[in-house]
């Protein structure tokens, strides 16, 4: 009997420890690179704005936790997650096999293709058409992997930048012939700005290195946070909040694939 009581006591202690170890989030820290309008950027007053920002704040509201945004260059997102600088990454991060080896992801936030951006009339459409030209990309993105694996081998001079704003500076100054980047960001952000008035995008690039699904990046093995974020994302769809935010930024365009 004494042995049985000890066993039960040990079980109770283990259960209590399990409850205590379950983290109760009162605040969620999201890493963001605010150089990617209309998904994430800064307003004139310095506040963060964009589709991702609104989604992140809405997820926090659904989960009844405080949102804290931590700015970082995109290349520092995964190292930042591993170093616990933030709990998740909401910054147009595409889900790729390579990234899935390093971190986990929530369910889908949205999907979007990749394209080239260049001066109107240049007509770039393939790696071959860019031979001898210079193309910029943001470090740490799926476009970097494509540039190194495909464009470099096609005789294209590629250059990495810490953020998308720096890419645009060199593109508009003539130091770059084109950029390779998220198509929606280009069409709905850069091309609608005064600086992008004389530019256009190519058709979407069809390549296995350029998947389209984006999600919230999470530290590897944090299944509890993944379940919490998935719950918040589902709630946004169920109560119509996602549709409202999407319409605010993109009108009738649907970015959600449901995959």
Language model features with spans:
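Sec/Tat signal peptide C-region and signal peptidase I cleavage site
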Residues: 16-22
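Extracytoplasmic small-molecule ligand-binding "clamshell" domains
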Residues: 22-92, 239
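Periplasmic-binding protein-like
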Residues: 34, 110-118, 191-230, 252-259
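Ligand-binding cleft/hinge of the Venus flytrap
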Residues: 42, 56-65, 143-162, 190-197
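Extended ligand-binding regions for polar small-molecule ligands
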Residues: 53-62, 124, 128-129, 134, ...
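Short helices/loops that flank or line small-molecule/ion binding pockets
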Residues: 58-62, 70-71, 75-87, 102-104, ...
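A conserved helix-loop-strand patch within extracytoplasmic ligand-binding domains
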Residues: 65-68, 93-97, 106-156
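A ligand-binding cleft/hinge motif common to bilobed small-molecule-binding domains
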Residues: 76, 91-101, 146-150, 177-210
């Amino acid at each position: 009997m004494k042995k049985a009581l000890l066993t039960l006591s040990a079980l109770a202690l283990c259960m209590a420890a399990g409850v205590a170890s379950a983290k109760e989030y009162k605040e969620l820290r999201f890493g963001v690179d605010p150089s990617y309008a209309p998904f994430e950027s800064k307003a004139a007053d310095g506040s963060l704005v964009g589709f991702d920002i609104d989604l992140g704040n809405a997820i926090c509201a659904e989960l009844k936790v405080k949102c804290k945004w931590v700015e970082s260059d995109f290349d520092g997102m995964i190292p930042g997650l591993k170093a616990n600088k933030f709990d998740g990454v909401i910054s147009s991060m595409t889900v790729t096999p390579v990234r899935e080896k390093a971190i986990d992801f929530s369910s889908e936030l949205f999907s979007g293709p990749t394209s080239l951006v260049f001066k109107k009339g240049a007509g770039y459409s393939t790696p071959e058409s860019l031979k001898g030209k210079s193309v910029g990309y943001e470090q740490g993105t799926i476009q970097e992997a494509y540039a190194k694996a495909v464009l470099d081998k096609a005789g294209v001079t590629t250059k990495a930048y810490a953020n998308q704003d720096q890419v645009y500076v060199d593109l508009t100054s003539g130091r770059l012939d084109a950029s390779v980047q998220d198509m929606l960001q280009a069409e709905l952000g850069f091309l609608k700005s005064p600086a992008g008035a004389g530019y256009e995008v190519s058709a979407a690039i069809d390549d296995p290195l350029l998947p389209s699904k984006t999600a919230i990046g999470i530290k590897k093995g944090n299944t509890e946070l993944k379940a919490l974020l998935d719950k918040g994302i589902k709630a946004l769809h169920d109560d119509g909040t996602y549709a409202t935010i999407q319409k605010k930024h993109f009108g009738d365009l649907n970015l959600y694939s449901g995959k």
